[in-house]
């Protein structure tokens, strides 16, 4: 808001002269001049451009004065271009309330640029205190930029010596030598050095204080007072702490206001509308914002102005009263932050006489103390090098705050932070003031630096850890550097060097991870997480970049990947350039659809960046603030490119690529902690798990990645491999598993805090976790279906939840109250030692832990000192971790922070969101999100040990959590954790102390006191690790002479007259003796109640951890199915259901039993099958059963058929058993001579003589049917092996012996061809076979074997004739061509067979050298008396004569005799063959059936052709038809599969008519070579 000015006149400051000692105002009217018309036009134009730049209460406009043109004039600081004249300005000469422009013109000076309308500043800039009521006719006062510039050009703030109720203004006449201080109430809270006060005391001695000072001081002054509380330690702000007295004004003094102390209090500035209130508020606001870095948002509510004018030193002579100093202190606060402005106008002396100063000049001795002291023995800050040093006189020429030499600004609310440069200090570790104190790990944060004084041409180098960047000088008090990119989080060294100087200005800069950094770019909806969003809307705070809202911005996209050992964060694309700084923008993904980022399309997540289009340049260094978003997936940008690269299912392809890559990486699941089963256990495991900021029930209950969850916890430190664990819990408090749903708990390959050395792949904080764990979750699950294969692989294989079956709750021990201790084994006792002691000590080669406590005496009560102590500080360290100390703050310093935390000796704070969790080497420290006042701190070590410190109402408790790996390893006041209370009182030397628990003195003297610490290392005890401040060592706290109260009950140690206290203790505490003891000792109800509360808390924790949760573990959810519930505790009944169009198979229900196991399943599996797949499985199962039943049955039938069909009739139709088949003709002759006749006799006994049949062989009967000889192929034996069908063992065979003895070559018989069987040929002339003697009788055989046989008969050979035919005339060669073919055959009618028999009137005897058909002819041994020859065999008695001639109707077909030995061998061979065929063919048939079934489903259109094909294949072949099957015949179904699995025939197969002359029926394949395929032989075959 503002007043529109149409005509503005330039205001010239009127030169005024103030006469010393007079209160009259002399107006100098001679210096007034008029303003030219050109000047008025120019000023009017300038005002029109800035007519809206008026300051309001809530949004003051920043104005940067030209501080480079400031000069000093008689102690006043003025702008050269705004002020003229050598005399002080007197604005009271101008009546600004007259609204008379013409009169103003007469009073204005030509050079002035100040524009004022309708305002009288005489009340502000004069000596009279103005009224605080409304001015300017009751309208709210509005300050202009010109007026603000004018009032800020003055060095000293306003103070008045006139006006007010008593007409003394701000002057404090009650302060003088006899009463050097005065009390003032604020009626508001003034934070100072950790404390907060609503009052102060103003001292004439150059300071204000808030607590009683000591009775006397010793110089040089030292604070805090080491002997506190025996000696008072004052809390004060010392601008010039030295004994003073009010001096006299010198004649040349330009300021006529009287010497002394001035005090003015301006309250509620934020709501004031009067002129003084508004101008005071705006002046202080901009002086602090521009003077102190990091205070850009400060807005004061109250100010205090204290001025010491013309103060002389105490102890001087009368003339020393004119040796005076003038200085001013301005305190501004919003009741959270407090700033102090020290204005040193004039310093002429430095020390008073008690400090050794000269009585005349105040020089020499110890100069004044300048600094701050918190009081109560806590902290102090001495402003070096000026305090108590000779360079104190330089205070008027140093500081340069707001461009004024002599102005020094400090921030003093919690810590003392210097806001101005310090030119005169030097050292190796000078404190560096910088803001902000933390920044995003990605870089780009502008860091303002204050500490050294800068010259415009200085070269500034800032080093962040190991990275150095160049800075730029802004002014003498400030330089800026841009934070580079980090690859780690936590605290980093921050150092500044000027020119060629070493890095001596040092500080610590906190690096925030991208996932936990303060969010600066916001996404109002979830569109950025989608694959194809229509738009992506972003917002940001427009004032985070610059206060100039007209500046142009640019938005860019960055991506991250890990394809090499080094992480890569790279620029991808510019989203938009020239964006207005409106705080919002909408991204249209369609604009980037045709982009081709070939080098970056493998980046799957990244960040949005917003910065200035045109960076500002300071000393050649471009400076532009940068805003980063949180990590976001880049599907909205790269989806079209990924679709072109991977297809429409790009998410599935990318998921598969990740799965393939992740399988090559090392498994990490065994390295992380096991999740607790319930949320209660997870919240009580302080050493291993901490809240997950992405799903926290207190601050972030949305749980984007864990829908249905209410709270998640994460492992507090990375594992030995750098991985982390996550455990999420549902509304019932049970662990959510990824086997049940994709929102379940998931471990991570990379921990969010990273892993040393951080700058390598898989070890970068936040970024590596997003790369390895978060983006795969998007690709496999969020961008696909939950039951997709990739998502289930992600959930079940790559990132599966660990069940809680093996979880073990930690052991807990604690200390609280006065103090009372509960050990790990639940032993309770009280120990009131005073000093520093060991609580827990573990000294193992792999596990090391030290937890120490400090006990200090309880504050006094109304009856005096209290002989009891309480816990005030705890320090802990583990292995190689940093040391963490948590200290109780003083009672009056707990208004903002209840506990102080020291990390490696430095204070750290958790007051901002990004600082809630801080990671240090080996240890993580965090403040729970629901805590805002730092009253609860949790320390987590990488070993799993945890320390929890809680404060309430000034009373502190500490609890230690240890995993089971520490069992039997602990020592100290918390005992030996062995589940046995008897060894808890173990001394450092390992001996057990005998302690009476009812006697506090016994535990104190015999056990606890042995664990006291000192500042030197002690064996089995260690060394004290506490932060030492102001020389307070362990000896300062240890008090072995302190004797506490050892009596347990208040009724026994309180005096009789305090029986009401005893009664009160019983009412408050009831059955808790710890509570009664604390109340009886301290009479503090808060302490007693919190003692009872802490005891209940640790008792409940122990009971909860001791409560074992029995878990049945993981029960997988079937794919395409669901479970009725996700519980896993005993008694849980889980029913399985399937999605629509799916059928459940297997177990439908499982029950968790009391033994922690799921009941035994009926089937062992549970599946949800599609209806089609279920039908296929049912069909396959049916076919499997059929095949399993039919195949053995068919095999059995085949075997039975073989036995029944080939076995001769039992009525005497069996042939001789030719057991030995010689290899050659010569061998046959040898066998005839050497075979035993006894063998023939045995054979004949087992044979049926055809001649003995009742029926005449002349006429065929049903018992002797005409049939073709079956297949009877004999395989030749292997070399050296004569065992086989017809071949006796080589070692036993007579033929073998004969062959060997005869010396004849052994001709290898081959049976792979077809042999003539002399079967009747079709259409051949009928031949009447003569009657023949079918075989020898048994008597004849017996006669042949009689001893009367002569030796000569050995040369004769007895043949075993064939059953149905006699061979006449020439003997027939046996051998390869004598083997019968595989099928019956006949010669063509009229063909001549040279081997065909000639039917004569009589039979011719068979020559002995010939072997008919099988050549199975034996030579039985013939007795020497026998002289019969083979030719006379059939003429022997008892043998019927052969018929004279054959019958007229001769037998056209005949049957070959079977051989029983051959039949047994053939049966075995056939059985083995069928077994092999079945074993091979059965799986092939099943596979072919499966393949055929699936092909049938895919190619239903070919079902008709398949049926036709099957019909053709099974019907008889028409001789007139010719079927040709080639590889190009498309009538064959499933041609594709056939060609893939079996080779196609090279030529067709034809059906040929038997009458065809080319049809070689009945003839052997004499022209075929081994291995050559034979022609088709009467059946339809497909080769």
Curated annotation (Swiss-Prot):
Main location: membrane
Species per Swiss-Prot/TrEMBL record: Bombyx mori (Silk moth)
Topological domains annotated Cytoplasmic: 1204-1472
Compositionally biased tracts (Polar residues): 1232-1250, 1405-1416
Example of a GO biological process term: cell-matrix adhesion
Record protein name field: Protein mesh
Cystines in this chain: 1112-1152, 1138-1168
Transmembrane segment boundaries: 1183-1203, 1473-1493
This protein's GO CC annotations: lateral plasma membrane; septate junction
Signal peptide per UniProt: 1-21
PANTHER family for the chain: MUCIN 4-RELATED, MUCIN-4
């Amino acid at each position: 808001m503002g007043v529109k000015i149409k005509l503005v006149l330039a205001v010239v400051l009127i030169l005024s002269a103030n006469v010393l000692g007079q209160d009259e105002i002399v107006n100098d009217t001679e210096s007034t001049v008029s303003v030219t018309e050109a000047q008025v036009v120019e000023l009017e134009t300038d005002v029109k451009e800035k007519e809206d730049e008026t300051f309001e209460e809530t949004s003051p406009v920043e104005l940067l004065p030209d501080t480079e043109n400031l000069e000093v004039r008689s102690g006043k600081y003025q702008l050269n271009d705004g002020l003229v004249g050598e005399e002080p300005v007197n604005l009271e000469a101008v009546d600004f309330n007259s609204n008379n422009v013409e009169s103003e013109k007469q009073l204005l000076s030509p050079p002035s640029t100040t524009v004022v309308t309708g305002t009288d500043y005489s009340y502000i800039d004069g000596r009279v205190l103005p009224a605080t009521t409304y001015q300017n006719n009751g309208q709210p006062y509005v300050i202009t930029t010109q007026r603000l510039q004018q009032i800020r050009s003055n060095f000293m703030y306003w103070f008045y010596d006139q006006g007010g109720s008593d007409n003394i203004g701000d002057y404090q006449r009650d302060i003088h030598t006899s009463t050097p201080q005065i009390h003032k109430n604020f009626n508001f809270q003034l934070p100072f050095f950790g404390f907060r006060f609503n009052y102060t005391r103003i001292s004439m001695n150059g300071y204000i204080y808030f607590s009683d000072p000591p009775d006397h001081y010793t110089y040089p002054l030292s604070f805090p007072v080491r002997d506190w509380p025996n000696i008072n330690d004052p809390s004060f702000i010392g601008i010039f702490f030295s004994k003073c007295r009010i001096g006299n004004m010198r004649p040349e003094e330009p300021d006529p206001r009287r010497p002394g102390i001035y005090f003015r209090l301006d309250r509620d500035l934020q709501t004031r509308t009067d002129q003084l209130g508004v101008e005071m508020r705006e002046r202080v606001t901009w002086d602090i914002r521009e003077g102190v870095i990091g205070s850009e948002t400060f807005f004061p509510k109250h100010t205090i102005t204290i001025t010491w004018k013309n103060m002389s030193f105490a102890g001087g002579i009368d003339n020393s009263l004119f040796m005076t100093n003038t200085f001013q202190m301005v305190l501004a606060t919003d009741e959270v932050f407090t700033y102090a402005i020290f204005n040193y106008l004039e310093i002429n002396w430095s020390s008073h006489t008690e400090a050794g100063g000269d009585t005349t000049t105040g020089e020499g001795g110890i100069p004044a103390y300048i600094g701050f002291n918190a009081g109560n023995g806590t902290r102090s800050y001495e402003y070096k090098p000026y305090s108590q040093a000779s360079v104190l006189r330089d205070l008027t020429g140093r500081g340069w705050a707001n461009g004024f030499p002599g102005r020094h600004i400090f921030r003093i609310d919690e810590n003392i932070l210097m806001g101005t440069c310090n030119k005169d200090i030097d050292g190796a570790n000078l404190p560096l003031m910088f803001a902000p104190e933390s920044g995003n790990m990605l870089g780009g944060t502008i860091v303002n630096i204050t500490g050294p004084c800068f010259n415009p041409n200085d070269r500034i180098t800032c080093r962040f850890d190991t990275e150095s960047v160049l800075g730029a000088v802004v002014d003498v008090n400030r330089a800026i550097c841009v934070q580079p990119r980090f690859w780690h989080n936590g605290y980093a060294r921050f150092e500044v060097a000027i020119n060629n100087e070493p890095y001596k200005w040092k500080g610590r800069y906190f690096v925030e991870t991208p996932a936990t950094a303060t969010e600066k770019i916001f996404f109002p909806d979830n569109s950025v997480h989608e694959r194809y969003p229509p738009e992506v809307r972003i917002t940001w705070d427009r004032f985070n970049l610059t206060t100039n809202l007209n500046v142009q911005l640019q938005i860019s996209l960055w991506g991250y990947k890990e394809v090499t050992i080094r992480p890569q964060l790279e620029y991808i694309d510019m989203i938009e350039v020239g964006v207005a700084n409106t705080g919002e923008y909408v991204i249209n993904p369609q604009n980037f659809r045709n982009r081709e980022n070939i080098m970056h399309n493998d980046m799957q997540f990244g960040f949005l960046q917003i910065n200035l289009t045109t960076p500002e340049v300071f000393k050649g260094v471009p400076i532009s603030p940068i805003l980063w978003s949180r990590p976001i997936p880049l599907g909205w940008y790269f989806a079209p490119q990924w679709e072109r690269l991977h297809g429409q299912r790009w998410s599935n392809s990318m998921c598969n690529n990740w799965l393939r890559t992740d399988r090559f990486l090392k498994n990490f699941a065994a390295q992380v902690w096991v999740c607790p089963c319930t949320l209660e256990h997870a919240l009580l495991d302080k050493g291993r798990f901490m809240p997950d900021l992405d799903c926290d029930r207190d601050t972030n209950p949305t749980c984007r990645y864990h829908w249905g969850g209410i709270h998640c916890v994460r492992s507090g430190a990375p594992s030995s491999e750098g991985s982390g664990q996550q455990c999420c819990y549902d509304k019932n408090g049970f662990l959510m598993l990824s086997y049940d749903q994709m929102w379940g708990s998931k471990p991570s390959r990379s921990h969010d805090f990273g892993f040393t050395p951080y700058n390598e792949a898989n070890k970068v904080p936040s970024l590596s976790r997003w790369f390895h764990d978060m983006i795969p979750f998007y690709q496999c699950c969020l961008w696909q279906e939950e039951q997709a294969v990739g998502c289930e692989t992600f959930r079940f294989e790559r990132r599966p939840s660990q069940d809680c079956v093996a979880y073990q709750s930690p052991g807990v021990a604690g200390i609280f109250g006065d103090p009372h201790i509960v050990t790990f084994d639940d032993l309770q006792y009280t120990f009131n030692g005073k000093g520093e002691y060991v609580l827990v000590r573990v000294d193992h080669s792999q596990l090391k832990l030290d937890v120490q406590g400090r006990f200090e005496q309880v504050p006094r009560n109304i009856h005096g000192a209290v002989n009891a102590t309480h816990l005030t500080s705890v320090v802990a360290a583990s292995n190689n971790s940093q040391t963490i100390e948590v200290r109780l703050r003083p009672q009056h310093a707990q208004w903002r922070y209840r506990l102080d935390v020291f990390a490696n000796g430095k204070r750290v704070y958790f007051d901002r969101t990004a600082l809630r969790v801080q990671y240090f080497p080996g240890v993580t420290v965090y403040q729970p999100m629901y805590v805002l006042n730092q009253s609860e701190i949790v320390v987590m070590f990488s070993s799993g040990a945890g320390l929890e410190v809680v404060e309430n109402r000034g009373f502190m408790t500490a609890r230690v959590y240890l995993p089971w790996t520490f069992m039997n390893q602990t020592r100290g006041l918390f005992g030996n954790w062995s589940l046995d209370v008897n060894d808890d009182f173990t001394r450092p030397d390992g001996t057990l102390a005998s302690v009476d628990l009812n006697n506090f003195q016994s535990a104190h003297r015999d056990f606890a006191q042995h664990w006291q610490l000192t500042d030197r290392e002690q064996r089995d005890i260690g060394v004290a690790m506490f932060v030492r401040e102001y020389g307070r060592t362990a000896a300062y706290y240890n008090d072995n002479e302190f004797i506490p109260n050892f009596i347990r009950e208040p009724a026994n140690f309180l005096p009789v007259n305090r029986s009401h206290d005893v009664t009160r203790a019983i009412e408050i505490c009831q059955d808790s003796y710890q509570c009664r003891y604390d109340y009886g000792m301290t009479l503090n109800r808060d302490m007693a109640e919190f003692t009872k509360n802490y005891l209940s808390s640790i008792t409940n924790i122990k009971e909860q951890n001791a409560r074992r949760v029995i878990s049945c573990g993981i029960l997988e959810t079937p794919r395409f199915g669901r479970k009725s519930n996700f519980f896993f505790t005993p008694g849980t009944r889980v029913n399985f259901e399937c999605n629509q169009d799916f059928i459940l198979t297997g177990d439908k229900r499982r029950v968790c039993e009391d033994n922690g196991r799921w009941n035994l399943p009926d089937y062992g599996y549970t599946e949800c099958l599609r209806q089609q797949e279920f039908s296929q499985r049912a069909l396959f199962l049916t076919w499997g059963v059929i095949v399993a039943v039919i195949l053995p049955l068919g095999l059995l039938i085949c075997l039975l058929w073989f036995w029944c069909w080939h076995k001769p009739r039992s009525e005497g139709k069996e042939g001789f058993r030719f057991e030995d088949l010689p290899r050659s003709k010569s061998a046959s002759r040898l066998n005839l001579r050497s075979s035993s006749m006894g063998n023939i006799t045995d054979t004949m006994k087992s044979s049926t003589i055809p001649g003995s049949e009742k029926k005449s062989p002349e006429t065929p009967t049903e018992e002797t049917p005409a049939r073709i000889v079956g297949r009877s192929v004999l395989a030749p034996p292997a070399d050296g092996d004569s065992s086989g069908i017809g071949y006796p063992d080589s070692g036993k065979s007579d033929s073998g012996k004969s062959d060997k003895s005869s010396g004849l070559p052994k001709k290898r018989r081959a049976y792979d061809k077809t042999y003539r069987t002399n079967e009747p040929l079709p259409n051949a002339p009928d031949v009447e076979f003569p009657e023949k003697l079918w075989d020898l009788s048994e008597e004849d055989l017996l006669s042949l074997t009689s001893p009367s046989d002569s030796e000569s008969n050995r040369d004769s050979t007895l043949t075993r004739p064939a059953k149905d035919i006699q061979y006449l005339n020439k003997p027939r060669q046996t051998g390869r061509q004598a083997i019968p073919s595989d099928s019956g055959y006949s010669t063509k009618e009229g063909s001549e067979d040279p081997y065909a028999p000639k039917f004569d009137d009589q039979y011719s005897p068979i020559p002995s050298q010939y072997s008919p058909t099988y050549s199975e002819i034996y030579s039985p041994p013939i007795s020497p008396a026998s002289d019969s020859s083979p030719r006379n065999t059939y003429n022997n008695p008892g043998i019927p004569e052969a018929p004279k001639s054959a019958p007229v109707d001769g037998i056209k077909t005949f049957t070959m005799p079977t051989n029983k030995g051959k039949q047994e061998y053939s049966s075995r061979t056939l059985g083995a063959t069928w077994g092999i065929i079945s074993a091979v063919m059965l799986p092939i048939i099943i596979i072919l059936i499966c393949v055929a079934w699936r092909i049938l489903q895919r190619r239903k259109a070919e079902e008709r052709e398949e049926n036709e094909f099957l019909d053709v294949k099974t019907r008889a072949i028409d001789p007139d038809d010719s079927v040709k099957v080639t590889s190009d015949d498309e009538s064959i179904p499933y041609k594709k599969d056939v060609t893939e699995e079996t080779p196609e025939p090279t030529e067709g197969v034809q059906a040929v008519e038997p009458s065809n002359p080319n049809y070689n029926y009945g003839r052997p394949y004499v022209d075929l070579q081994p291995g050559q395929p034979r022609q088709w032989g009467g059946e339809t075959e497909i080769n």
